[in-house]
Amino acid sequence: MGNIFDKVNSPEDLKSLNIEDLNSLAQEVRKFIIETVADTGGHLASNLGVVELTLALHYHLNSPKDKIIWDVGHQSYTHKILTGRKKKFHTIRQYKGLSGFPKYSESIHDVIETGHSSTSISAALGLALARDLKNRNDRIYAVIGDGALTGGMAFEALNHAGHLGTDIKVVLNDNAMSISKNVGALSHYLSRIRTDPTLSKFKDDVEVLLSRIPKIGNTVSRSVERVKDGLKYLFLSGVLFEEMGFTYMGPLDGHNIQELITNFKNADNIKGPVLIHVNTKKGKGYKPAESQPSKFHGVSPFKIDNGESKRKKSNFTYSQVFGQTMVKLGNKDKKIVGITAAMPEGTGLSYFKKEFPDRFFDVGIAEQHAVTLATGMARAGMKPVVAIYSTFLQRAYDQVIHDACIQNLPVTFAIDRAGIVGADGETHHGLFDLSFLRAIPNIIIMAPKNENELQHMIYTAINNDQPVAIRYPRGEGYGVELDNDFSTIPIGKGELLCDGKDVLIIAVGSRVYPAMEAARVLSQQGIKAAVINARFIKPLDKNLILNKINECKKVITVEEHALKGGFGSAILEFINENDLRGIKVKRLGLPDRFLPHGPTGHLQTIYHIDKNAIIESALKLVDERVELGLWPGKNA
């Protein structure tokens, strides 16, 4: 790396640099990010787009006294590098390494932890109100993307801040693309401000004209100012934000450090809320990412020369199978519609979008709206499928209850990324959906053991007459052959995969295959385990489970989900409701804490939901000597 990069280890080190130095540093930082993410994987395109913006912010502000809140937070790599974490940057998103998102435990410069979108302005306003109550003078900047700005929470915060007149600055990082291309009226509005040369020139002309209007006396002056304000509202960009009580500045060139610093200084001279509109290019400085920013949003390790992944995928992912199944079903049934909240590629609905654009609806970052939109379609006789990550379904919990389940409407929830998701960590693991869905009347909850079973569950759900949720994991399936024809899975019917009388293993979703492998190993030690693929978390297969529990008396449940309120809890409730006595139960699942980031397989092992954990639990249930370490293959 260059001499400037090596010397910068804190925001304070930027203060002595001139603009030429800052521009050189930007290129060095960009190169460092590309080289590191090529080895580790991570969020690339968004970070390459905000290098100059981040440098300008830290040059202008005095962090951590002054506060920067990064919406979503996946674009905070330059911020991390500048705030003392350069030497640890090679550990980004690795187990026990740096988080890919702002983390207060890592640095006091990460004042607010983020991961989900549209939260930054609310947090910034909270910090600002506390500042004012304490009579402090901290400068508070929220950085939010144009994609995140489509989230309703962002507008709630803008409305409140504008109403209060609180002194906060909101930097709108406008790259015209969040993860996928932005949608909606706001996107079109920002696009017009950003790209319309006529509007830009007219704005300049109006400003010049208004500046020439003379002021004669206080009364006349006030009248003239009102006229000038009226003309501005008629003709100038940024009216939407001005109407909400913000002073609008921009749009600015987000890669021009001098222009950014100058305008940040000007913004600080304005008391009250200011929105600074900045245009950036996602993926800037790396041609593959510039040409395909969606592909380079979140990447696995890749080859720098061509951007191709270093990892070869051998099997279809669950998301791909979901998307392809939607296309097959959509060809046969024109009532099927697909709905997503700004994640068509991630969920696999992009396949459906390509084939049936008129039946595909991307609502932007608006999960609540997505769910209630689906209920309206269901009431009108359509068959809506809402494709959503488990972690983002949390945002629409009230709508699932109030709009879908109370009315018992046939909406299918395709819940992707259910379970451990790996490197994105606490904010993105999908560990709570069973707990919060299981408590709701009228909903059916399923989980497939493999990608073939997933397609049959989708078919079953779409042709059902009540709300159905299907949860499935991130990543590749097992490479099993996919049936050409779809079949209906009887509601509430599990699957006995192997029989035995010594111990019963009831597994859910991604844990079925490890349970089968554990049963095979146990059989080699003379222990006959029965394995049930639950398929349904709600309703349970009461007859199958009751018969096998009574027969085996020793039960293991295993799930890739939080133990509290999860599938194991459902089995305990079932045992209690049926007044079963003398039953030993061991629940395997995830603990009552937020799990860190790290490789999925590694986390499954250290949190004891892998094959070996099932084997050990079975041995302990079957033979009490195991507690003393006396089972076969172990020494006392």
From Swiss-Prot:
Q: Name one Pfam family in it.
A: Transket_pyr
Domain of life of the organism in this record?
Bacteria
Which positions does UniProt annotate for Mg(2+) binding? 146, 175
Signal sequence, start to end: none
EC no.?
Answer: 2.2.1.7
Needed cofactors: Mg(2+); thiamine diphosphate
GO biological process entries:
1-deoxy-D-xylulose 5-phosphate biosynthetic process; isopentenyl diphosphate biosynthetic process, methylerythritol 4-phosphate pathway; terpenoid biosynthetic process; thiamine biosynthetic process
Q: Which SUPFAM superfamilies match?
A: Thiamin diphosphate-binding fold (THDP-binding), TK C-terminal domain-like
* UniProt keyword annotations, A-Z: Isoprene biosynthesis, Magnesium, Metal-binding, Thiamine biosynthesis, Thiamine pyrophosphate, Transferase
Could you say which residues bind thiamine diphosphate here? 74, 115-117, 147-148, 175, 286, 367
The Swiss-Prot or TrEMBL record describes its family as follows: Belongs to the transketolase family. DXPS subfamily.
How would you summarize the oligomeric state and partners of this protein? Homodimer.
Q: What functional role does this protein have?
A: Catalyzes the acyloin condensation reaction between C atoms 2 and 3 of pyruvate and glyceraldehyde 3-phosphate to yield 1-deoxy-D-xylulose-5-phosphate (DXP).
List, alphabetically, the PANTHER family matched: 1-D-DEOXYXYLULOSE 5-PHOSPHATE SYNTHASE-RELATED, 1-DEOXY-D-XYLULOSE-5-PHOSPHATE SYNTHASE, CHLOROPLASTIC
Full protein name: 1-deoxy-D-xylulose-5-phosphate synthase
Q: Which source organism?
A: Halothermothrix orenii (strain H 168 / OCM 544 / DSM 9562)
